[in-house]
Swiss-Prot record:
Residues 587-768 form the Lon proteolytic domain. InterPro entries: AAA+_ATPase (IPR003593), ATPase_AAA_core (IPR003959), Lon_bac (IPR027543), Lon_bac/euk-typ (IPR004815), Lon_lid (IPR054594), Lon_proteolytic (IPR008269), Lon_Prtase (IPR027065), Lon_prtase_N (IPR003111). SMART domains: AAA, LON. This is Lon protease. Belongs to the peptidase S16 family. One of its GO terms (biological process) is protein quality control for misfolded or incompletely synthesized proteins.
Length: 799
């Protein structure tokens, strides 16, 4: 290596420059332009180094290869768009010793790499072989200019020969960089020879593929010509027997099927078109598939069964325990249909957490009405064509899910359950929710248009029922449906469901007789309390399924006649308890409140923690809280400060104290205003030092005047409180009327206290009374450096 020198660096993307190469480059990055400007002020020497990742716009020294080329700038031209066109000539290999950041560009300390002259018989033999191989390569690769064949053989120096050929190879940047980093001339020639051999093999395969494709195209054109001749002959001689039989069969089906006038005209037109086509043509297959779909869906085929309300009620009661109000509304719906013999009523939408029986309720309604049940899953549907079908111009086109469901039902008055309607999405392919508007509108669905069928189809006799976990769907879609909420089950209801439905099903699935698998009520209750925490019964079914599997195993292992799941076996089979039930903190604590939340999966408890520390009056909020909950905290903060003296808090405390409010389970986003009174209680507790009762939970929105306003999801929240072992729940006075919808077992298990003001909340929740204080501003002034609670970003830090 020669003596070290320092040069500006020009990082290259997607190109490796070799010595003796003259290359035009377009430079647009600021650092690269400034490096060139610096070079032009000096001796026009620059280091060209390839960067490792071509997508990197600002490569660091570690992102650049350590071997490059010392080059001379021959010409530089600034273009109108701010970029620079530069002509460079590679001089010699250079190894980078270190990089220096000059802010506007990088400099590198380099040393030129000395190479041997490559003299010797081995180098001479390799040079001849490489030149011969290069001639073969140029014949196959049309991208190499023909003049290269004239210039390359004239190069006498083996090293220069290897570099010149490497510059013309269509190989990966990494392979070219490897060649640049090979300083031994003989090894470099060997590497170039190996790379050319690999490229020649690939080019030969490409040539074979091109020849094969060309022959295939000629064959296709020949087949087309022969098919046209065959069609002419067929017109003279008549159709073959098979094709004629198929056409006769299609004609009979068209006459037999009760098509609409529009559909019959379309079918006859397509059949006429099919008669004039070759049976072997691709277009005839498309037409045959279309006619098959058109004639396979039901036209005027209806199953009739009079709705018997007593029988329907018996089916609903047999299939589902509890859900009395839901079943009552469904029976009302069926009664109106039975009386009017019409389906012009609202579309029912069953909304509730997972595992509460929405889909099975749909099956029961279908059984009660005597209709064919078809489930149409909409979860993950993002393409409008999945609802309306694809147009026939596309390869592999077919009707949408609605028409496919009708074909499966084989009757025009089927029962179609649109499952998970809230899980649809939309993207550049359209909005499937908008396509459903026509399906679910009784005044429009008699002329439903599927893109594939291209004729109107009558859906007015179909009974549509939808299911969803939440109401997170477009408003026009919601307007077409009547929402029936299915809340979570109480503990007693889960117990009965397990005994009546889950255990018999599991025993049958696992080959167990009732006498072999005995699960007492206590074991089921323990599973509900300590191993599941859900609104539905899916987790309970999984836990009972685990007990059944272990029972089957132990019946074979222990050679006993039956197994009873007592406390010992439950602990052995189910493992460690996953949840606490009926256990509260041992002591009342300052700043820790139990709130109640509603999610699309049911109710849940929401622990809120608050601490104070010396500071400058800042409020810090953590726990993945969204905007509405942050505003609720701000309102609670303002209310507490406005009533500070009545609560026993002197105003200077606010300027000297930082308060941190945290809602655990930070991975789960949280939003909504119903934790307002819990936030206010936490602030008062932490600022006064008075503990909060450990066995109390609450829900309610707060106003700036301290009034407690109504919230939603009361039943789900009370169920969550009961599941969690809370004894007392504070609810807004305005929600007292909603207690009529809450099961009596829940009301019996909780002490429910309606409140209308924050003062009442503090009275019930704090363990001690609040002592008002007096404050003389002259004696204890508020300093001007205190942070004002004006709602700006300085008053509240959120993370």
């Amino acid at each position: 290596m020669s003596e070290l020198r320092t040069l500006p660096v020009l990082p290259l993307r997607d190109i490796v420059v070799f010595p003796h190469m003259v290359v035009p480059l377009f430079v647009g990055r600021d650092k690269s332009v400034r490096a060139l400007e610096e070079v032009m002020r000096g001796d026009k020497q620059i280091l060209l180094v390839t960067q490792k990742n071509s997508a990197d716009d600002d490569p660091a020294p570690g992102d650049i290869f350590e071997v490059g080329v010392l080059a001379t700038v021959l010409q530089l031209l600034k273009l109108p768009d701010g970029t620079v066109k530069v002509l460079v000539e590679g001089k010699a290999r250079a190894a980078v010793v270190s990089f220096t950041d000059q802010e506007s560009y990088y400099e590198a300390q380099i040393g030129e790499v000395s190479e041997d002259d490559g003299a010797g018989p081995e180098a001479e033999a390799l040079s001849r072989a490489v030149v011969e191989q290069f001639e073969n390569y140029v014949k196959l690769n049309k991208k190499v200019p023909p003049e290269a064949l004239a210039s390359i053989p004239q190069i006498a120096e083996p090293g220069k020969l290897a570099d010149s050929i490497a510059a013309h190879l269509s190989v990966k940047i990494g392979d070219k960089q490897n060649l640049l980093e090979i300083f031994d001339v003989v090894k470099r020639l060997e590497k170039v020879f190996a790379l050319m051999e690999g490229e020649i093999s690939v080019l030969q395969v490409e040539k074979k593929i091109r020849s094969r494709v060309k022959r295939q195209m000629e064959k296709t054109q020949r087949e087309y010509y022969l098919n046209e001749q065959m069609k002419a002959i067929q017109r003279e001689l008549g159709d073959p027997d098979d094709a004629r039989d198929e056409l006769i069969d299609l004609e009979k089906r068209i006459k037999k099927t009760k098509l609409s006038k529009e559909a019959r005209t379309k079918a006859e037109s397509e059949l006429k078109k099919l008669r004039n086509m070759s049976p072997m043509s691709a277009e005839s297959t498309v037409v045959r598939n279309y006619l098959d779909w058109l004639l396979s869906i039901p036209w005027g085929k209806a199953k009739t069964k009079k709705i018997d309300l007593v029988e329907s009620e018996g089916i609903l009661d047999a299939d589902h325990y509890g859900l009395e109000k839901v079943k009552e509304r469904i029976l009302e719906y069926l009664a109106v249909q039975a009386r009017t013999n019409s389906l012009k009523g609202p579309i029912l939408c069953l909304v509730g957490p997972p595992g509460v029986g929405k889909t099975s309720l749909g099956k029961s309604i279908a059984k009660a009405t005597g209709r064919e049940f078809v489930r149409m899953s909409l979860g993950g549907v993002r393409d409008e064509a999945e609802i309306r079908g694809h147009r026939r111009t596309y390869i592999g086109s077919m009707p949408g899910k609605v028409v496919q469901s009708m074909k499966k039902a084989k009757t025009t008055n089927a029962f179609v359950l649109l499952d998970e309607i809230d899980k649809m999405g939309s993207d550049y392919r359209g909005d499937p929710a908008s396509a459903l508007l026509e399906v679910l509108d009784p005044s429009q669905n008699s002329t439903f248009g599927d893109h594939y069928l291209e004729v109107d189809y009558d859906l007015s006799q179909v009974m549509f029922v939808t299911t969803a976990n939440s109401l997170n769907m477009p408003q026009p879609l919601l307007d077409r449906m009547e929402i029936i909420r299915i809340p979570g089950y109480t503990e007693d209801e889960k117990l009965e469901i397990a005994k009546r439905h889950i255990l018999p099903k599991l025993a049958k699935d696992h080959g167990l007789k009732p006498a072999e698998f005995i699960v007492p009520d206590k074991a089921i209750r323990d599973l509900i309390r300590y191993y599941t925490r859900e609104a539905g019964v899916r987790s309970l079914e999984r836990e009972l399924g685990a007990l059944a599997r272990k029972t089957v195993r132990d019946l074979a292992r222990e050679k006993v006649a039956s197994i009873t799941i007592d406390d010992e076996r439950l602990a052995k089979y189910a493992g460690v308890k996953k949840y606490r039930y009926g256990e509260t903190d041992e002591v009342d604590q300052v700043g820790i409140v139990t709130g109640l939340a509603w999610t699309e999966f049911g109710g849940d408890i929401l622990t809120i923690e608050a601490v104070k520390m010396p500071g400058k009056g800042r409020m810090q909020i953590t726990g993945n809280l969204k905007d509405v909950m942050k505003e609720s905290i701000a309102a609670a903060n303002s209310y507490v400060r406005s009533r500070a003296l009545q609560f026993g808090i002197k105003p200077p405390v606010f300027e000297k104290t930082d308060v941190h409010i945290h809602v655990p389970d930070g991975a789960t986003p949280k939003d909504g205003p119903s934790a307002g009174i819990a936030m206010a209680l936490a602030m008062v507790s932490v600022l006064t030092g008075i503990p909060i009762r450990k066995d109390i939970a609450m829900t309610g929105e707060i106003t700036l005047r301290g009034r407690v306003t109504a919230i939603g999801g009361l039943k789900e929240k009370l169920l969550a409180a009961l599941r969690s072992g809370v004894k007392t729940v504070l609810i807004p006075q305005e929600n007292e009327k909603d207690l009529a919808d809450v099961p009596q077992t829940v009301k019996d298990g909780l002490e429910i206290i309606p409140v209308s003001t924050v003062d009442e909340v503090l009275k019930h929740a704090l363990t001690g009374p609040l002592t008002p204080v007096e404050w003389n501003e002259a004696e204890e002034p508020i300093t001007t450096s205190a942070k004002k609670d004006d709602g700006d970003s300085d008053a509240m830090l959120t993370h």
